[in-house]
Amino acid sequence: MSYTFSTYETLALASLVLLLGYFLVKRINVLKTFNIPEPVVGGFIVAIGLLIWHKIDGTSFNFDKNLQTTMMLVFFTSIGLSANFSRLIKGGKPLVVFLFIAALLIFGQNVIGIASSMALGIHPAYGLLAGSVTLTGGHGTGAAWADTFAHQFNLQGATEIAIACATFGLVFGGIIGGPVARFLLNRQKQGENPENDEVDDIQEAFEHPTYKRKITARSLIETIAMISVCLLIGQYLDVQTKGTALQLPTFVWCLFTGVIVRNILTNIFRFQVAESAIDVLGSVGLSIFLAIALMSLRLWELAGLAIDVLIVLAIQVAFMAAFAIFITYRAMGKDYDAVVLSAGHCGFGLGATPTAIANMQAVTSRFGPSHKAFLIVPMVGAFFIDLINAALLKVSFAVVNILA
């Protein structure tokens, strides 16, 4: 038996999931102490409830994917609209360093996946499937490569395993980012900032998700218009480039379109973009997207994972936490920005870029802004990382072919 939630039902439940997350994080000290994002808390609890329901009578639940996709695109578009070219240029050396670190993580994930699977006596392709293809790559990349695994290595249930591995990574990417940041902050003895201080419009978007904003009806309408135009252009470019060398995920086109539109308006037409409205709409899009993504998790699919693959994934989670603490944090300067970047790296290193942003928001809402982190992570996680992952996966495939 299967039940599909309508658009309105999905939106209503996602909103309740977020409110549940806010309620629990505010009242349960351990969740607040370790900076666990509210959508992860609420969404995971609902996912567990649906798992119990599924075990009782076998009912599966489906949610409106169009709403989830739209909220994701709104979020990435708002990231683009919040970026000035002058800020992008400032990314400079730290951006290159973080990109190199992200590539190093991909290499490490694949080495650990292959080595662990061989030590456990299973086909090394299973270890590779529990590596960067599903962790750094996420559900989309994992599902896209699953057929290749099935045909090239004759793996049984490759698609199901890929989705389950990506689900595992998404959950733990949202869980370990906060504790990693907490551990590093304790080293620095970083104090909290008040949560309800007002911030002005020149503050970077997304860094203060709980702070008050000054928004007018006009600024909100102008921002909705900008986002709508960017979504339209991004979707058009996605359709036009499909099957070509320029093919990219839709959200990347929307992000780049947002950057172009923002800088044309700011630098040519001298239009003052309402950062506060972009911030609010982007944060709302991110929260609703994550809530739907988390409550859509079919946790019973994890039960289908072989114990050997689960062991490989557990090793990957420990490796990600250690990598963020000893590599990402140190390479990015061992300062507060490096702490926030480390939390974000846990998010997209195991899950997805929205999870990374949620991890960073959970930190910055309590300990202060990090302009560098909110500039670098979306750029690397949303675009560059997929290209690097694809290139390194081809090398890993060749290695598995030799070892198999």
Curated annotation (Swiss-Prot):
Catalyzes the sodium-dependent transport of glutamate. Its main location: membrane. The chain crosses the membrane at residues 5-25, 33-53, 69-89, 95-115, 161-181, 219-239, 245-265, 277-297, 307-327, 338-358, 373-393. Belongs to the glutamate:Na(+) symporter (ESS) (TC 2.A.27) family. InterPro entries: GltS. PANTHER family: SLR0625 PROTEIN, SODIUM_GLUTAMATE SYMPORTER. One of its GO terms (cellular component) is plasma membrane. It is found in: Cell inner membrane. This is Sodium/glutamate symporter. GO terms for molecular function: glutamate:sodium symporter activity. The gene is gltS. GO terms for biological process: L-glutamate transmembrane transport. It is a multi-pass membrane protein. Keywords: Amino-acid transport, Cell inner membrane, Cell membrane, Ion transport, Membrane, Sodium, Sodium transport, Symport, Transmembrane, Transmembrane helix, Transport.
